[in-house]
């Protein structure tokens, strides 16, 4: 079995990913990173991290690939609001690993999703029941995305609106609530120089 350990701060091309038994991403771990990675590899620690970027299938799929070369010291920001996963959603490009992806030594199941009106500080909240269906204790990150189904506005296909992490023993279930505040539904209005919530279905 071959396990690939990545240490870096940005996505890389992984054409050989299918030949790996597993991939562990250490990001930029610092002086304690070696021991932390050993703990994950030996099973002393159950990983629960999620990717902070989208991993493309090919380098040519990266939006800056066409105007960034090894001979240039800078690259122009041409992505508009479509940064990171928003770009891949917009162009419907297949990717190797999605933003927010991550595995564990246990498994989780979701159910009973419900959305309720919010209180003083949020527009609404999303509640979902998460169950640890494996045989090891572990942690899961619940991610809630918003998507506008109608209305006008220059916006991404979907956006991460909130998240929450829960630790569960084997067989344990927990209702996880993620508050969705006004900013999760807002667009910036250049005329008003302020954030505005567009009417419509989300």
Label every PLM stretch briefly:
Residues 137-144, 156, 188-191:
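Short, hydrophobic/aromatic beta-strand segments
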Residues 152-190:
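Intrinsically disordered, low-complexity Pro/Gly/Ser/Thr-rich segments with frequent PxxP/GP/PP motifs
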Residues 193-201:
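A glycine-anchored, Pro-Gly-centered beta-turn/N-cap motif
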Residues 5-139, 145, 149, 170, ...:
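Secreted, periplasmic, or luminal enzymes acting at the cell surface/secretory milieu
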